[in-house]
Amino acid sequence: MLKIKKPKITARKAGTIGLGVAGYIARWVFILAISYILLYPLFYMISVSVKAPTDFVDTTVIWVPKNFSFHNISKAFKALDYVKSFGNTAMVEIVSALIEVGSCAVTAYGLARFDFKEKKILMFILILTILVPLPMIITPLAVRMRYLDVFGILGLIGEVIGVDIRPNLLNTPWSFYIPSIFAVGLKAGLFTYMYVQFFKGLPKELEEAASIDGAGPLKTFLTIVVPSSGTIFLTVTIFSVIWHWNDTYLSTMFLSKDYPLSVNLARILNADIGSKYDAKTVGIIMAGCLLVILPMLIMYCVLQRQFIKSIDRVGIVG
């Protein structure tokens, strides 16, 4: 009869196994804690948004409402003027974000691939735009949009003819488009820096081959670099769209009508409906927040897999 020897587990092996189990448990506790911190506001927002007015005074109702109701969502939809505000957001913020994605890429390619005397100065200015907070430059920026000029030429002509011919871009989408076109819009410095770091990591052989075949810098960028840089383009696009979508600072400075969703939500929070903040209004406020972030949640859910892959790729190359 064969005797099977039981493997001996030494104290050292037992300690190693114990540390492994403890590390596994600690890792999952940490993940669950972070998930709770991040997801709790969203779950709370959804729960409150679909509660009936009677559920707010019922102490037995915590997460799952006894009476589901779209009353809060309907009220918030009307208060936000959702359809019109969504159109304003798409026309102003989303278009600006997409323009910025392209202009920052072109600017970054020039900084990453070409050497010239002023390159270090431009890189210093680029870093400076990331470090300097927006409130420090918002006043001169708003004045520039009110009296748009090019090296003072229009102002000089206006003084000669006695008529101020400097255009007023406030309350127009152009106050957002023009900074985006010249890669100086919202978070443009950060996006340009991300592009620069990514382009530096791309191999130059294909670009050199295209140059030998007679392709210029722009054609090389469009035919070689852009198809090879889908990951960074996706990353910057998502960040740019989200930052523009959530922006209220520039929108309140440049616009006095036709507000985007983020500004209308802020106005609701600051108005009587927000100042009361009782059981009747908290549901409407949470429903308004849910309606504003819903398009971004849908976008992220659709692009989640590609976004995670792009983040990994950008981290490796950049």
Residue ranges and their predicted role:
Residues 1-18:
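Short, Lys/Arg-rich, polar N-terminal cytosolic tail immediately upstream
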Residues 4, 23-318:
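A structural signal for multi-pass alpha-helical bundles of membrane permease subunits
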